[in-house]
Amino acid sequence: MTGPASDAALAPVRRPRADTARTADLTSWDAPGWAGLRVVVTGLGVTGFSVADTLAELGAAVVVVDGDDGPENRARAETLRIVGVREVLLDRAATQALPEVDGAAADLVVTSPGWRPDQPLLMAAHAAGLPIWSDVELAWRLRERAGRKTADWVCLTGTNGKTTTVTMVEAILRADGRRAVACGNVGTPVLDAIRDPQGFDVLALELSSFQLHWTHGLAPASSAVLNLAEDHVDWHGSMDEYAAAKGKVYANTRVACV
């Protein structure tokens, strides 16, 4: 484990770093820099598994960390080891510091959305100057791939009604003859969607404030914030921070629905 600083010396990650020189050129599936990239993946739920599996397919050196060593995570860990993930640490103590990857410092952390900005491993990564991405950020960078269609992204967030609206958007697009899928925080993990061999015309993404907090370069075809009410203040630290996370969906969008 790296990072001698105590928790008291660290601060919650309110403005996560997007890139370093090592990650700045990782903007397509075919970018050569994925191979050998040292990545720590936090969380081994559906999202974390998808992230680790994708990165292993790209040739990255991956260490996964999760505090839950229950049977479901142990089964997932075994599968990830088979596909080439270097190490899976299922121990609460392992979540308290930033692990090395192949005996060296990590280049990148990709976090599951449930991990809070005041989690010790994430604070240590930020203090060390590492980029911290969501699965959505990773998927956005991987969306272009030689020989595959590049889908348009339609992104929806808000305090209430996200799942209903995204499911409706998916149905409307399919009725119009387009190959579409509801993904992100609902349905199919977004990394599974972009790896689909047939590809999609449109991804209808439900995005949580947790995912948006760790997302940096997203530039969708269209975006909407359905509504905004006080929620998840304990995770974000304040209502202003919660609203700012939701507002990131508009930062680079081509069409904003307000």
What are these model-derived regions, one by one?
Residues 97-104, 113-257:
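Phosphate-binding loop of NTP-binding sites
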Residues 1-134, 138:
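N-terminal leader/targeting and accessory segments in enzymes
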